[in-house]
Amino acid sequence: MKHGIKKNKLSRCTEHRLSMLKNLSISLINHEQIVTTLPKAKALRPYVEKFITIAKNNDSLHGRRLLLSRLHNSKLVVDKLLSVLANRYQDRKGGYSRIIKFGTRKGDCAPMAVIELVDRDISAKGEIYSKNKKGSKVVTQS
């Protein structure tokens, strides 16, 4: 019986849904703003906010390994979470993301939404946190 389970299944099996949420969260953390459907954005919001809370509270090796295990071993995204986003949201208790309704998609009239991180640098649109060949972290323009 499924008493008290209120998560949206998004018409997908468990593995597909979790993989999709991980990929969407990696894109959101990397770009700090993405356009997706409204149900996906609503399912993604608590998922990403838990990652930011883990990064804020666990700046140790344990926190890094916990985030790596939940984000497809994406080291650049975990580095950005621990260095940039954890410092940005140090004083904020929660509510790290916002959902803005964006109209409907032309093909199937699906409701679209923009999900973005609060207090993001708007002038850094299109920049991606990455590493150069020497191993130092840089922000590149995409």
From Swiss-Prot:
Keywords tagged on the record: Ribonucleoprotein, Ribosomal protein
Residue stretches in coiled coil: none
GO molecular function list: structural constituent of ribosome
Domain of life: Bacteria
GO cellular component: cytosolic large ribosomal subunit
BP-aspect Gene Ontology terms: translation
Complex formation: Part of the 50S ribosomal subunit. Contacts protein L32.
Family per record: Belongs to the bacterial ribosomal protein bL17 family.
Cited NCBIfam families: L17
Name the record gives this protein: Large ribosomal subunit protein bL17
Top-level taxonomy: Bacteria, Pseudomonadati, Pseudomonadota, Alphaproteobacteria, Rickettsiales
